[in-house]
Swiss-Prot record:
Signal peptide per UniProt: none
Protein name as annotated: Phosphoribosylaminoimidazole-succinocarboxamide synthase
Gene: purC
Biological pathway: Purine metabolism; IMP biosynthesis via de novo pathway; 5-amino-1-(5-phospho-D-ribosyl)imidazole-4-carboxamide from 5-amino-1-(5-phospho-D-ribosyl)imidazole-4-carboxylate: step 1/2
Listed EC numbers: 6.3.2.6
Superkingdom field: Bacteria
Keyword Cytoplasm on entry: no
Organism: Chloroflexus aurantiacus (strain ATCC 29366 / DSM 635 / J-10-fl)
BP-aspect Gene Ontology terms: 'de novo' IMP biosynthetic process
Length: 249
């Protein structure tokens, strides 16, 4: 597929203008994987294709569920065609179980289950390690309106339970999930960016020892070829499993 000019480039993707439609953009999924706000970086050959496949599978499911997203098409495994958005500089995190940074902040929460899923906001700022930000501060800083904060909270929970149900059909527990939102030129709020195997914690049979997500890379003491091959195999399995969500639909 022909690509337009580069709009922006991040750690794991490049965003291109669409060559013919100014309302669209094209995401190119790179082979990079990072952890610690980019402090650890590696390249896994083929990861971009797997990330693109997973993202397409996820967003097709969300679109079928009636959730407003930026996803339009995935003409190639590495490419995602999306509605062009101005991104809101927030990570919206939904949690069913306490893990990761939440458990470090709230060790007393070990063993709890959040119903409905807990929603937290984090300001996208690598230099400050993406600090948590309260809804009232989001509003005070003019990042989003009160209505948008409410919409992101409600939509975040809908996204989570939709993906949670899909994973449950495969005996996989969705522990937590990170998403982002963008605004179209018309002001519509959409689930945007990517949702791939870097975006969640997933535990087959509810067992963290079997985790399939990026946490394997984060947790590793040593990054070597064996680790990267293992991570790639897990990403390939996730791309294949999420592909089953569209079977027969």
């Amino acid at each position: 597929m022909e690509l337009g000019y580069v709009l922006t480039e991040g750690k794991t993707k490049i965003v291109y203008a669409h060559p013919t439609d100014p309302d669209l953009a094209i995401l190119y999924h790179k082979d990079g994987i990072t952890a610690g706000d980019g402090a650890r970086r590696s390249v896994i050959e083929g990861k971009g294709e797997l990330a693109g496949q997973t993202t397409a599978n996820v967003f097709r499911l969300l679109n079928r569920a009636g959730i407003a997203t930026h996803f339009v098409d995935a003409p190639e495994p590495r490419l995602t065609v999306v509605r062009r958005c101005r991104m809101i500089p927030l990570e919206v995190v939904m949690r069913r179980l306490p893990a990761g940074s939440y458990l470090r902040r709230h060790p007393e929460a070990a063993g709890q289950r959040f119903d409905p899923p807990l929603v937290e906001f984090f300001l996208k700022d690598d230099a400050r390690h993406d600090p948590q930000i309260a809804p009232q501060e989001i509003i005070a800083q003019g990042i989003a309106t009160p209505a948008e904060v409410e919409q992101m909270t409600d939509t975040g929970r809908k996204v989570f339970v939709t993906l949670e149900a899909a994973w449950q059909q495969l005996d996989v527990t969705l522990v937590d999930l990170k998403i982002e939102f963008g605004r179209t030129a018309q002001g519509d709020l959409l689930v945007a960016d990517v949702i791939d195997n870097d975006s969640w914690r997933i535990w087959p049979s509810g067992d963290p020892a079997q985790m399939l997500d990026k946490q394997v890379y984060r947790n590793a003491q040593v990054v070597d070829e064996a680790l990267l091959a293992d991570v790639r195999a897990r990403y390939a399995l996730v791309a294949e499993l999420t592909g089953r969500w569209g079977a027969g639909s």
